[in-house]
Amino acid sequence: LIKILKNVQNEVRDKFTFQYKIVGSYSRNMITYDSKSNIGFDLDVNIYPNDDFNEYSPQEIKTTLIKAFRKYLKKYKYSKIENSTRVITIKVNDTKNARIIHSVDFAIVNDYEDEEGYQCQEYIRFNKKHNSYTWEEQDDGFYMLDEKIEWIKDEDLWPELREMYLKRKNSNNDINKKSRSLFAESVNNICDEYGYFE
């Protein structure tokens, strides 16, 4: 994964640079695997483009990255790339057994501070119906995740969070809902259920 990211960084360097961070369940030691399904594990990565002067539109940024990923897919055994609403997804497929070995979801994000001093994040959203790309603010559920997770750990609720996340992930039938969203929902539900918001 790191090798393909380094190649993509070099490929797009003439236009813009970017940093990346592995986020989601992997970064929190919550990778899951359901042996009964045809879906292997997945990873979530945030890509932070360095476009301080807003030289590139959201469409230019995302399509440039897709083109670069596509160039290196086969070299690293990835067989498919998808341009989803919130992420770019690449997959390693086991065609013989008709299953996904693993997939990686790349969200293109920008962290910033608003006028009131709050840390915020926006992501590039692809509207398939209108074939348009825009920067959109993250949903409220994505904010303060680290603080909520610390509270969950302090309250010894980590097993409850793992159980809820596993249940949500294994029963998820919405192909557009990625594990990072399911994890954030699980964190917020545990916080709501056990009194974080009181």
Task: Indicate where each model-derived feature is located.
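Short, extreme N-terminal leader segments that mark the start of a protein/domain
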Residues: 1-7
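Short glycine-rich, low-complexity/disordered patches
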Residues: 7-23, 74-90, 172-185, 194-198
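Active-site nucleotide-donor binding segment shared across nucleotidyl transfer reactions
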Residues: 10-43, 47-55
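Conserved catalytic core of two-metal-ion nucleotidyltransferases
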Residues: 12-16, 62-114
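Glycine-rich loops and low-complexity Gly/Arg-rich segments
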Residues: 44-48, 70-73, 130-137
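Short, conserved charged micro-motifs
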Residues: 53-63
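Right-hand nucleic-acid polymerase module
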Residues: 82-84, 97-198
